[in-house]
Amino acid sequence: MVLLAASCRSGGGYTSADPNGRPTPRRLAPAQSGAAAGADLYDPAKGVVTVDDLDRLRQRILVVPVLGAYPVDVPNSFLEGRSNGRRHNAADILAPRGTPVLSADDGVIRRLSTNALGGITIYATDPDERFVYYYAHLDGYAPDLHVEQRVRRGDVLGYVGTTGNAPVNVPHLHFQIMRLLDRDRLWDGVPIDPKPFLQLPGALR
């Protein structure tokens, strides 16, 4: 059995200048509307998530993005503290190294990158580009995975590992959901607690 443990602000019209010195318009995600959601379900230090956002996310019917994992096992780790005063803002899904990491939703692969914190990572968006799904500490990518690839819920994206700042003896998937605000800054959205929205067990499509 798999065990589970546990800024971008809207506004502005321009990003950094292009190589010719001209400002380039920001590519904003779908606009928000309605009342703000309860602050226990997102990180208000990063921006606002509305009740409408959460309703739309719930309608996505996400799967737990690790093969063999179940929603009931997902911990309440979103609010946990981390070093340097950071909040976790994610769910850590423990599984043996090499366990398939699955696409939580239909959507598009937007960025494949490696960094010191997340290690081997994937950024994907839902079909409406309203939400970002971030998968980190991977051991590697699925064969032929590429940017702009369309994926379906339950497709294999990669494999659980310990890359980045993950403990070498604790392979896991760091999974984060963000409300996308700027399409050019996928990493800089508003984190949303994954637990209430992972409704189906991790199974292959």
PLM feature segments, named:
Residues 1-6:
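Sec-dependent bacterial lipoprotein signal peptides
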Residues 7-12:
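Bacterial signal peptide processing site
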Residues 14-120, 153, 162, 192-205:
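Surface-exposed, glycine-biased beta-strand/turn segments
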Residues 55-58, 135-147, 153-162:
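Generic detector of contiguous secondary-structure segments
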Residues 89-92, 131-134, 181-188:
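Small beta-barrel nucleic-acid-binding modules, principally OB-folds
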Residues 94, 125-127, 178-180:
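A generic structural motif
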Residues 103-147, 170-174:
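Zn2+-dependent peptidoglycan hydrolase active-site motif and core
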Residues 149-205:
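Conserved, short, structured surface segments that act as functional micro-motifs
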